[in-house]
Amino acid sequence: MDKIRIRKLISSLAKRDYRRTYMNDFFLTWEKTDDEIAATFLVAEILRGLREANISCRMFDSGLGISLFRDNSTRTRFSFASACNLLGLEVQHYIDISGLDSKSQIAHGETVRETANMISFMADVIGIRDDMYIGKGNAYMHTVSEAVQEGYRDGVLEQRPTLVNLQCDIDHPTQCMADMLHIIN
């Protein structure tokens, strides 16, 4: 993709209403408006074009992307890490298989609220995969979201990281949107 095409995509992005996506989590595809979904596709195309043209996509000079997986994963974990790297974020992997991770304090009674705030220090984004139990994954993501919002509001966190659903019990928005963009192209 050439620079002219990239500029045209950026211009078309300006015509979309995606204001609600700023400082907002991305949990479920059906919670987003058509403009927000279209804007997400445009940003993906712009990033692809920049990458193909060997133009840096770094938006961050430093920062963290937290990869919180409560299930096994290869493709999704690697894709999230690659996306964070493309934007200039270092990735910290926090793997908590079904909440019983003996390497964390969860096994010793640490609450979701405590864990969420602890892993959120200096974080810009948290990608969560929790798809093992119906009725649990999406609820867990909302609990984490509420905890980091509370931590930010109360001054525990200097910034509030955005949460991205990397797969839950009711939706896999990153995969759905990647599949749709593949079909579109």
Where are each of the predicted segments found?
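Positively charged, low-complexity intrinsically disordered leader regions
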Residues: D2-F78, S82
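Phosphate/diphosphate ligand-binding glycine-rich loop within oxidoreductases
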Residues: R58-I66, D71-I184
